[in-house]
């Protein structure tokens, strides 16, 4: 067997804060309890397997939610087709038609928190998203190559010159301090309020054929497709540059 290790793409804060304790980041537990007691979060976990590291982080997050009175629901599923996997996580059923709602309306919830299986996070990272009180809000992480999965503006002219949209670099993101709007965010670490998916027709993550100018066409991924539909439905997509999580990748050496 070839030796393997985990390459963790992320800041020391995102990857090392697990042992510091939830209370050290949020000393006023009673204030969090006052704001969010009785709220219900559906944690959406698409994927086929999860590391021991993920299990420890996620278990701690569930315990911290319970400590302040947040109800939690876990929805997990998998398909080799990522767009279908995400719809399965939301309890979709093609026989319900294009106007169906998540989980067939059987689950009352306030937020969906989407977490990919290779994200390294802390409870504090989650509660910082929650406190932004936005319909759609994301943190950020690094992809192999040093870019984030975030496009602030899907500029057609840039696409014509490069063959892809301009992703924000790690360096550029690290220099930002304020919440900002984006045209596209990856779905590895994003919080979405109830009402957003309910206002978008099924299938919520169907890849789209997009046209760039007169003669360029491309097929966008499932998360790009959702972002396009959400913006067309009138929702802003927000990014908090102060919420950086880690990104684990398996490395053969």
Please place each PLM-identified region on the residue numbering:
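Short, positively charged low-complexity motifs
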Residues: 1-3, 8, 21
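N-proximal low-complexity "stem/linker" segments adjacent to membrane-targeting elements
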Residues: 30-81
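Residue-level detector of anion-binding/catalytic polar loops
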Residues: 71, 118, 135, 236, ...
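Short, conserved alpha-helix that lines the donor NDP-sugar binding/gating region
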Residues: 82-105, 228
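Conserved catalytic core of nucleotide-sugar-dependent glycosyltransferases
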Residues: 90, 122-209
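Short beta-strand-to-loop acidic/aromatic patch adjacent to the donor-nucleotide binding site
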Residues: 98-120
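Catalytic donor-sugar/metal-binding loop of nucleotide-sugar-dependent glycosyltransferases
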Residues: 181, 194, 199-206, 211-247, ...
């Amino acid at each position: 067997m070839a030796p393997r290790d985990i390459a963790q793409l992320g800041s020391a804060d995102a990857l090392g804060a697990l042992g510091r304790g939830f209370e050290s980041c949020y000393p006023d537990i009673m204030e969090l309890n006052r704001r969010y007691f009785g709220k219900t979060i559906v944690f959406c976990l698409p994927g086929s397997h999860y590391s021991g590291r993920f299990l420890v982080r996620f278990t701690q997050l569930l315990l911290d939610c319970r400590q302040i009175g947040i109800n939690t629901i876990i929805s997990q599923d998998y398909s080799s087709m990522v767009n279908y996997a995400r719809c399965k996580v939301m309890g979709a059923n093609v026989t319900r038609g294009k106007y169906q709602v998540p989980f067939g309306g059987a689950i009352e919830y306030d937020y969906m928190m989407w977490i990919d299986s290779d994200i390294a996070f802390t409870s504090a990272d989650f509660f910082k998203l929650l406190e932004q009180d936005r319909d759609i809000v994301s943190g950020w992480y690094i992809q192999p190559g040093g870019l984030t999965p975030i496009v602030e503006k899907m500029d057609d002219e840039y696409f014509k010159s490069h063959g892809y949209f301009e992703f924000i670099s790690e360096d550029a993101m690290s220099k930002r301090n304020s919440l900002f709007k984006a045209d596209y965010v990856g779905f590895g670490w994003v919080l979405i309020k109830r009402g957003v998916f309910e206002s978008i027709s099924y299938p919520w993550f169907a890849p789209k054929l997009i046209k760039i100018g007169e003669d360029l066409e491309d097929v966008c991924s499932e998360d790009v497709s959702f972002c396009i539909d959400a913006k067309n439905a009138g929702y802003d997509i927000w990014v908090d540059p102060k919420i950086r999580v880690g990104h684990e990748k398996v490395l053969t050496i």
